Amino acid sequence: MIIIDGSYGEGGGQILRTSIALSAITGEPVKIINIRANRPNPGLRPQHLNAILALKKLANAKVEGAEVGSREVTFIPGELKGGEIRVDIGTAGSITLVLQALLPAMVFAKDTVEFKITGGTDVSWSPPVDYLINVTMFALRKIGIEGEIKLLRRGHYPKGGGIVAGYVKPWIERKELIAEEFENIYKVSGISHATNLPAHVAERQAKAAMEELKVLGVPIEIKKEVSHSLGPGSGIVVWAETECLRLGGDALGKKGKPAEEVGREAAQELLSQVKTKACVDKFLGDQIIPFLAISGGKIKVAEITKHLITNVWVVEQFFGKVFEVKGGVGEKGEVRVVRKAW
């Protein structure tokens, strides 16, 4: 059994998500201790619990310590089968963070996995669903992963109620990812949404983002989406199309925050990524690590984050030396697979 210290590095829920996904993939039992030890409210939160329970079902696993507040979890995986996975987080807990745990395991299931998850689609401290659909999945297709994620309904803090569904097929053809530096940006796309709010909120967010992004001198198309759900909320995701991958920026609206500020924030986030010329933005940088370990390849990242370093560490607890990372936290960097996980 592999023992993972959950207080390592940034000590958040990511250690848990990656560890249990890798346990499910490898069939190697894992015990995670000191879960979220560095957080103000340590232990499992509802979205972590839901990720574990979904992986338990997917991997026919035995689990000990799976309850809110638990600081130690043991996961003993069985066989990764396909089928249907239903997850109701029950709060505005992040759907995308649950999917971050599920995706690496789902691609190793024997058959196609269909999923439907209810919770928060656009919430603080997690990737918005539009980023996952348009940036993360775009990158995963490059390495041979087939699947689709669809947004059925938005869910914001505190009520949630968002619904995301989709499917992932078994990963048969594993393509190496070489994504170092881009030369050209072809266009910028985006989605600006307003839920249970006036249409002008989405329009103002989009307009402000477009004003900032004009400096790139490329076509810009930001869709405006107005919808209804359990509670109000707004946000915007923008992404740049290059010859290698897509780089993204995003921002969430909140009460008292002008829509223009939200739009500018997302645009500035994107501009800070693309000025590095790295093919991989700082958000995708950590998300891609478990997949890169298996596909092989070499990437340049706009910024090495603590999340990336932590994910590298977790992968290497299972597989030994896999990566060579150049660059310090907060700097542009490079990640190279020196030995594929398998």
From Swiss-Prot:
GO-annotated biological processes: RNA processing
A GO CC term assigned to this protein in UniProt: cytoplasm
The protein's enzyme class: ligase
UniProt-annotated location(s): Cytoplasm
Gene3D superfamilies referenced in this protein's UniProt entry, alphabetically: RNA 3'-terminal phosphate cyclase domain, RNA 3'-terminal phosphate cyclase, insert domain
Keywords: Cytoplasm, GTP-binding, Ligase, Nucleotide-binding, RNA-binding
GO MF annotation: an example: RNA-3'-phosphate cyclase activity
Metal-binding as UniProt keyword: no
Pfam families xref list: RTC, RTC_insert
Enzyme Commission code: 6.5.1.5
Activity regulation annotation text: Inhibited by GMP.
Temperature dependence: Optimum temperature is 95 degrees Celsius.
PROSITE patterns the UniProt entry points to: RTC (PS01287)
Domain of life: Archaea
Catalysed conversion reaction: a 3'-end 3'-phospho-ribonucleotide-RNA + GTP = a 3'-end 2',3'-cyclophospho-ribonucleotide-RNA + GMP + diphosphate
Record's keyword annotation contains Nucleotide-binding: yes
Family: Belongs to the RNA 3'-terminal cyclase family. Type 1 subfamily.
Function summary: Catalyzes the GTP-dependent conversion of 3'-phosphate to a 2',3'-cyclic phosphodiester at the end of RNA. The biological role of this enzyme is unknown but it is likely to function in some aspects of cellular RNA processing.
Entries under PANTHER family matching the protein: RNA 3' TERMINAL PHOSPHATE CYCLASE, RNA 3'-TERMINAL PHOSPHATE CYCLASE
Stored HAMAP family: RTC
Further facts: Generally, RNA 3'-terminal phosphate cyclases are ATP dependent, but P.furiosus enzyme preferentially uses GTP rather than ATP.
Protein's UniProt name: RNA 3'-terminal phosphate cyclase
Species: Pyrococcus furiosus (strain ATCC 43587 / DSM 3638 / JCM 8422 / Vc1)
